[in-house]
Regions:
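Substrate-binding cleft of carbohydrate-active enzyme catalytic domains
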Residues: 1-151
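Surface-exposed extracellular loop regions of Gram-negative outer-membrane beta-barrel proteins
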Residues: 154-162
């Protein structure tokens, strides 16, 4: 919050970024640890923000040489997690007295092979009449942009920055 206030005093606009669905290894690892913490006592709480399908057999290598840094966009818990993060960022801007005018969601560097081995993704694609992985990614980004629109500010999807 101090950074936001400091920037505002100097007429600098800070644009938050959640680079998704790729570049998400830290979030995935953190939510996997949360899952392990709660799975024996509260399955619902364990799965609340889960970002990965443990049965996914997809094989890929990201530009950063990771094989586990892309969130599963077919899981309701992924959207729940992103709503939580976005709402926390919105609240931080409000608390700092800074207008949130843009939001960057990334969308780049999603490696070939992602989601192909996820039965959750296959089922989701069938239910939503998506024909390929590109359609799934586009569907996800549209959902995120709608999520941001509901919070009344502009967004950027990694192809253009407002």
């Amino acid at each position: 919050m101090d950074i936001l206030k400091y920037a505002k005093e100097r007429h600098i606009r800070v644009i938050p970024e959640i680079d998704i669905p790729g570049h998400s290894r830290a979030a995935i690892k953190a939510m996997n640890a949360r899952y392990q913490k709660y799975i024996d006592t509260d399955q619902s709480k364990a799965e609340e923000y889960l970002l990965t399908d443990f049965a996914d057999t997809s094989q890929y290598l990201s530009a950063q040489n990771f094989t586990d840094n892309v969130i599963n966009v077919a899981m309701p818990s992924t959207y729940h997690f992103l709503e939580k993060v976005i709402d926390e960022i919105v609240q931080m801007y409000q608390d700092a007295g800074v207008e949130l005018t843009a939001f960057h969601v990334g969308g780049d560097e999603v490696p070939e092979g992602i989601w192909e081995g996820s039965s959750i993704c296959r089922t989701f694609m069938q239910e939503n009449e998506l024909t390929n992985i590109r359609d799934l990614k586009d569907y996800f980004l549209e959902q995120i942009l709608e999520m941001l629109d509901k919070r009344t500010y502009r967004q950027s999807d990694g192809r253009t920055l407002l």
